[in-house]
């Protein structure tokens, strides 16, 4: 059997932004501790923004101002620093942070901390959003599928997961789409970078 070594660990303080390389992580029921405790809300569409729908977010990186303590989590979110594509850094407490995010995205945005798990207000989908999100064309776009490709097989998801996905943009208590932890091999990352684009 070939030995496997961990090459890098990354934590992503803000959903859909670049993250921070860290020396160690703690895995809990939500995934990596203090991962994706912030998200950007698309105010015009009343939904949590994703990199698929607002790719400009990927041009930013985020890090915590200080290392999150063990109590960090839903409803107890530490300050975050965001580095914008022009190199300007803004803190989550800066009064103009939302203006900068809105300018970057080209529409009204708001940086939002993860609320308590019982508060589903930032997760709940409206009917029009639900219908739009699960239209075959939207699913194909989200998963990078061509019109001629088969749609994904949803039988891999439990009934509870499907019900959660049908009601919420992200599961309550987290800003992850579905999988709280991703394990990638260096070979997989290298194959994604064949054109010279770097991935973290």
Enumerate the language-model features and the residues they cover:
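Electropositive, beta-rich accessory/interaction domains or terminal extensions
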Residues: 1-199
